[in-house]
């Protein structure tokens, strides 16, 4: 589980580097999660929400409303990109 968590966090780093092409960045992962793992795409949204909560807890006052909004927008974009193969 820890190794998968590390991969997930690295993928969010990739998202930040590729905000203008999230669907392309996550195309292979979308295919993997849809075709092979049969993951419920709602879980991508849930994971994003959990990540926002964890970051808010970790950064405290530094996690301003502006940072929260940007983070939520990014995790929503990642969730949408991961769910792309399902559409």
Swiss-Prot record:
Give the tissue specificity: Red blood cells.
**Hey, what's the signal peptide range on this chain?**
none
Asked if the Swiss-Prot or TrEMBL record annotates the protein with the keyword Membrane, the reply is: no
Question: Any transmembrane segments, and where?
Answer: none
The UniProt GO MF terms for this protein read: haptoglobin binding; heme binding; metal ion binding; organic acid binding; oxygen binding; oxygen carrier activity; peroxidase activity
Q: Which GO terms describe its cellular component?
A: blood microparticle; haptoglobin-hemoglobin complex; hemoglobin complex
What are the protein's UniProt keywords?
A: Acetylation, Heme, Iron, Metal-binding, Oxygen transport, S-nitrosylation, Transport
What InterPro entries does UniProt report for this protein, alphabetically?
Globin (IPR000971), Globin-like_sf (IPR009050), Globin/Proto (IPR012292), Hemoglobin_b (IPR002337), Hemoglobin_oxygen_transport (IPR050056)
Which residues does heme b bind? Answer: 4, 33
Q: Which residues carry this modification: N6-acetyllysine?
A: 23, 85
Q: Name one Pfam family in it.
A: Globin
In this UniProt entry, the residues modified to S-nitrosocysteine are: 34
Q: Where is the Globin domain?
A: 1-87
Q: Which GO terms describe its biological process?
A: hydrogen peroxide catabolic process
What family does the Swiss-Prot or TrEMBL record give for this protein? Belongs to the globin family.
Self-association state and partner proteins as the record states: Heterotetramer of two alpha chains and two beta chains.
List, alphabetically, the PANTHER family matched: HEMOGLOBIN FAMILY MEMBER, HEMOGLOBIN SUBUNIT EPSILON
- What is this protein's function per UniProt? Involved in oxygen transport from the lung to the various peripheral tissues.
What protein name applies here? Hemoglobin subunit beta
Gene name per UniProt: HBB
């Amino acid at each position: 589980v820890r190794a998968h968590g590390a991969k997930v966090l690295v993928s969010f780093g990739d998202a930040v580097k590729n905000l203008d092409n999230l669907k392309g960045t996550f195309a292979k992962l979308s295919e993997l999660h849809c075709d092979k793992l049969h993951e419920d795409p709602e879980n991508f949204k849930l994971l994003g929400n959990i990540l926002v909560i964890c970051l808010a807890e970790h950064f405290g006052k530094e996690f301003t409303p502006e940072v929260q909004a940007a983070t939520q927008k990014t995790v929503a974009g990642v969730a949408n990109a991961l769910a792309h193969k399902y559409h």
